[in-house]
Amino acid sequence: MKIAIIDYDAGNLTNVVRAATRAGLDVVVTRDPEEIREANAMILPGVGAMKDAMDHLSGYGLTDIIREEVRKGKKLAGICLGMQALYEVSEEGGEVPALGLLPGRIVHCPEGNLKVPHMGWNELVMHRPHEVLAGLPEKSYVYFVHSYYKTPGDSEDIIASADYGVTVPAVVGKDNVLGFQFHPEKSGPVGLRIWKNLAEWLEK
């Protein structure tokens, strides 16, 4: 099976490709619509600002392709900014329309006693079972780097969260769409297990 890692000039491709390959996935890094259509599943990585990300996706003609393939039932996993892009709108850079594959908004992490951006290790709090988190230790810590987060108001899609003064949705998903706010590829042995689980999920 071929997994398309979507390249839209939004960073962290090298680490994601390395982790995906280590997990046993056969990947192609591409922004070519036909290669994305021909792939069996998709990964949308990303770091940076939402407006730039959506401008790049749109500029490469990929927004409609991604939506179309998801509607057909193709699996999609978003990582960090790629997860945030799954939602309807982001406050980062104004009111930025995103892919709209999941309901909800991306908002700024609240300023207070905790530093923003949120950088560091946090424990995953499980909300419901999902195969992508199978076999993790009881206390599993993963690595976050972000200033914006998905409001937890639409809680049905939350698989796991982290506490950072607010409830930060950490793993989200519905049907053939999954998202990770943290970086599994930077999360040590726990992240490696998540990548192996993700590989199995993508290939089903």
Which residues make up each language-model segment?
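Cysteine-nucleophile active-site neighborhood
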Residues: 48-121
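Short acidic low-complexity segments
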Residues: 27-38
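Structural motif
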Residues: 43-45
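Short, surface-exposed beta-strand/loop micro-motifs that present aromatic residues
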Residues: 166-173
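Acyltransferase
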Residues: 180-204
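Pocket-forming structural segment of enzyme catalytic cores
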Residues: 88-164
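Extreme N-terminal starter segment of soluble prokaryotic enzymes
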Residues: 1-4
